[in-house]
Regions:
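Extracytoplasmic beta-rich repeat domains
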Residues: 1-7, 15-16, 28-46, 55, ...
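Hydrophobic beta-strand positions that form the internal "hydrophobic ladder"
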Residues: 10, 50, 91, 137, ...
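Residue-level marker for isolated small/hydroxyl-bearing positions within beta-strands
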Residues: 13, 53, 94, 140, ...
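Repetitive beta-architecture junctions, highlighting loop-to-beta-strand starts
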Residues: 17, 57, 98, 144, ...
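WD40 beta-propeller blade core
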Residues: 20, 60, 101, 147, ...
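Short loop/turn segments that connect beta-strands within beta-propeller blades
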Residues: 23-26, 63-67, 104-108, 150-153, ...
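Polar/charged low-complexity regions in secreted precursors and cytosolic/nuclear IDRs
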Residues: 48, 63, 94, 104, ...
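Short, loop-centered acidic/histidine patches that primarily coordinate divalent metals
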Residues: 221, 228-229, 235-238, 247-249, ...
Length: 286
């Protein structure tokens, strides 16, 4: 899964059934935690604590300095691949068992568990990286639904299949809008402030059939996105206007890491890793 770094410590899970903490400066091993199955989940670090889920039906909070497991929740029924969300006093994540979980971030105690829609683990909100704002958690699932959930109670606030989105969601920097890719050509934007599904814009990017769980990310008024076929793109966050498109090979591009509206880091399953630089005046990118 996607690693995270804080206080000169890099934390990541591995298919060899371990969770590692490395010195970010020299790569030296600081600690290692053995689990009972491959660890495919991404990592989120807050206040010196790393949150990560595994395939052994456990979700762990780990002190990144010592490698000590602060708490472990063993109520997960499927494996975890998502990047956990830390919001207020909660840590929130989905698993391939139909459920979205909300745990107390300090104790690991289950606060609520959400599931709605068709039965079966293949419809789980497990690949999406949840986001939250204004007391609501937002997810998109394989049932092609975009959902807002009350962060306090775990009850559904609204749920819509209008735009046929799938497994991607991103939050605007001002926390007033959410973004999601549809399964064909387009990115949509909805309000994050309303108690009903209010679409703000839809943009035809022209990427074709799409199902890659790479999240849209806003930086300095630009929504950065990527696809399963090597395409990266930037949209105006307020209007959806396509600002630029850039292709790197034909493999899946992971969730982009924008450093500014002019620069973003990317990795691809084909092995590519790089820095994309965008000049908005000349519309050139390299």
């Amino acid at each position: 899964g996607t690693p995270a770094a804080d206080k000169n410590v890099v934390v990541f899970g591995s298919a060899d059934m371990n969770i590692y903490g490395l010195n970010a400066s020299d790569g030296r091993l600081l600690w290692k935690i053995n689990t009972e199955a491959p660890v495919l989940g991404a990592v989120t670090i807050r206040n010196g604590i790393a949150y990560i889920g595994g395939s052994d039906h456990k979700f762990r909070a780990i002190d990144i300095k010592s490698g000590t497991v602060v708490w472990s929740y063993d109520g997960v029924e499927g494996y975890i691949e998502t990047k956990p969300l830390v919001y207020d006093n909660l840590v929130i994540f989905g698993a391939w068992d139909k459920n979205l979980y909300a745990l107390d971030k300090k104790t690991g105690k289950e606060v609520w568990k959400w599931h709605e829609g068709k039965p079966g683990r293949f419809y789980s909100a497990a690949a999406v990286w949840p986001v939250a704002a204004n007391g609501k958690v937002f997810i998109a699932d394989p049932e092609r639904a975009l959902t807002a959930i009350d962060a306090s109670t775990g009850k559904t606030v609204w749920r819509t299949k209008e735009s046929m989105v799938r497994e991607t969601v991103g939050l605007s920097e001002d926390k007033r809008r959410i973004y999601s890719k549809t399964m064909n050509d387009s990115v949509v934007c909805y309000s994050a402030t309303t108690d009903f599904p209010e679409k703000i814009w839809a943009s035809n990017v022209g990427f074709g059939y799409e199902h890659a769980p790479s999240m849209p990310v806003e930086k300095e008024g630009v929504v950065f996105g990527s696809t399963k076929n090597g395409l990266m793109f930037g949209l105006d966050a307020h209007t959806g206007k396509v600002l630029w498109k850039h292709k790197v090979g034909n493999s899946l591009i992971s969730t982009l890491v924008p450093l500014s509206k002019n620069k973003c880091l990317f990795t691809a399953t084909g092995g590519e890793i790089g820095l994309l630089v965008i000049d908005y005046k000349t519309n050139k990118h390299k």
